[in-house]
């Protein structure tokens, strides 16, 4: 290798090392500068996230033609000063399922006074009972998230601590679960958690077994939920 080439190679390597050292210096200065502004930058990022969330909620409300509902606060626990009201007031007017085509969806009205805990939805198959349950559940979840609701003005919805639902057929061949047993597993879990600050949605309660036995089971489940003062909506089979 010619001596001139060796000298040029050494010089090229020196320049590489100087470049790497300069990059490290620049990055170090930048990191130190950012560190001095860490609190301000953190606050700015959080503020931008809050603003982005508020803008997204506003745009979504505009798409849904949504309104701001009245939020009903928690009931008082038994024995507390605010424990006089028997139940939550639920008043959804012209409520629309937010995921269905607005041009085709049929609005529903759902109302529970403060003296009621349960509402039974009955009607023919494909009549919209399950969609009604899902609509109420989504309204409750959206209210919890601080979203406006696709409902008419004057609607009111409670603030629930828990929303529990058993909707649809979850039979499992792998776990040897029939339609009835899968529903029963879900309901057992719900009964163990739901309390007077919960919304419980049950679809086709007691279905999948002998009608007489299913009716007795449904009655026992509803009685238990009523005793616990759970706000409950049930669709019949």
Task: Report the location of each language-model feature.
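Short intrinsically disordered, low-complexity coil segments enriched in acidic
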Residues: 1-7, 34, 42, 190, ...
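Charged, surface-exposed helical/loop "interaction arms" that form contiguous linear patches used
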Residues: 20-74
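Switch/coupling subdomain of P-loop NTPase systems
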Residues: 2-39, 104-106, 115-117
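ATPase nucleotide-binding head domains, primarily ABC-like/P-loop NTPase cores
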Residues: 73-236
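Detector for methionine-enriched segments
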Residues: 8, 55, 139-142
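Solvent-exposed alpha-helical segments within well-ordered globular domains of core cellular machineries
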Residues: 6, 10-17, 21, 28, ...
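Residue-level signal for inorganic ion chemistry
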Residues: 1, 51, 203, 237
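Residue-level signal for secondary-structure boundary sites
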Residues: 6, 59, 98-100
């Amino acid at each position: 290798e010619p001596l001139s080439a060796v000298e040029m190679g050494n010089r090229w390597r020196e320049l590489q090392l100087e470049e790497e050292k300069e990059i490290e210096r620049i990055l170090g200065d930048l990191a130190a500068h950012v560190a001095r502004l860490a609190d301000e930058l953190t606050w700015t990022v959080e503020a931008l996230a809050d603003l982005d969330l508020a803008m997204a909620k506003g745009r979504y409300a505009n798409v849904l033609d949504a309104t701001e509902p009245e939020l009903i606060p928690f009931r008082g626990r038994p024995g507390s000063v605010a424990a006089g009201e028997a139940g939550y007031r639920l008043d959804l007017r012209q409520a629309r399922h937010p995921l269905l085509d607005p041009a085709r969806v049929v609005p529903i009205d759902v109302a529970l006074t403060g003296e009621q805990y349960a509402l039974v939805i009955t009607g023919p198959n494909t009549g919209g009972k399950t969609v009604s349950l899902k609509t109420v559940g989504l309204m409750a979840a959206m209210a919890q998230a601080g979203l406006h609701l696709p409902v008419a003005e004057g609607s009111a919805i409670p603030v629930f601590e828990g929303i529990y639902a058993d909707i649809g057929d979850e039979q499992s061949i792998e776990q040897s679960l029939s339609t009835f047993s899968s529903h029963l597993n879900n309901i057992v879990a719900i009964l163990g958690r739901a309390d007077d600050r919960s919304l419980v949605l049950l679809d086709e309660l007691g279905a999948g077994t002998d009608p007489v036995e299913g009716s007795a089971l449904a009655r026992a489940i509803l009685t238990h939920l009523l005793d616990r003062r759970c706000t409950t909506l049930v669709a019949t089979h």
